[in-house]
Amino acid sequence: VQIRDLVATPDLDNNYTDGSLTIQADIRNFGKKTAKGYKVCYSLYANKLYSDENEPVILARDTKGAAIRNSVVAQVEPITTGNTQEAEKVVLKVKNPNKWSAETPYRYTLIAELKDHKNRSIETVSTIVGFRKVEIKDTPADQDEFGLAGRYYYVNGKTIKLKGVNRHETNPAVGHAITREMMEKEVMLMKQGNINHVRNSHYTDDPYWYYLCNKYGIYLEDEANIESHEYYYGAASLSHPVEWKNAHVARV
């Protein structure tokens, strides 16, 4: 029995103060018998080196202030052999977390621990999350700092001016065989040049590129490599039929 997938979706409340983290894990059973009594325990930590003094961000306490648990538990329904079952969806509430933005790319570490019916740890995985709310809103002139009405990009309730570049995953010296060191150098050049936005030109990139943009604070515009060029090809383009929407989105 193993964790097949882990999806964590962060959000902020309407005041952009407190955070929530919606978590969904898929559990797969490769055994010969139905797996019963499994659960997933989630803990959220500040993104720093672990030590004995490092407490989870989410920590339930009793009326006297003593810690009673440091994780949220999601139950898993019985999984027949060869199949996958979604664990119970849970939402972690975090009081006034540090927010993620290009200027302050603060991140947290989510730990997911799969346990069996005897409470034995079977597998542990982790992922990085940042609390932020991204919105595109019609803004009247009296609410804009420059007195200009328009459709603006907001991060955590504040308008953001995107200063971006297109990026192809290629290098004149090594072609498409870009190293991680080269990627990190690119991000450093962007930050030094006050660039806060990058568009992956036409296709998804190496997962490490997404990791770096998340780590250093770059607003990343991802694309599905469909090459339909919006409405360039006219009515015959697959950009038009809504039936193809899910297929397009799945490519991102």
Model-found features: residue ranges?
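Generic structural signal for helix capping and beta-alpha/helix-loop junctions
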Residues: 207, 228-230
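Hydrophobic residues in well-ordered beta-strands that form the structural core
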Residues: 220-222
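Catalytic metal-binding/acid-base residues of hydrolase active sites
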Residues: 225
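Short acidic, glycine/proline-rich loop/turn micro-motifs
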Residues: 54, 232-236
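Active-site neighborhood of glycoside hydrolase catalytic domains
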Residues: 215, 236-252
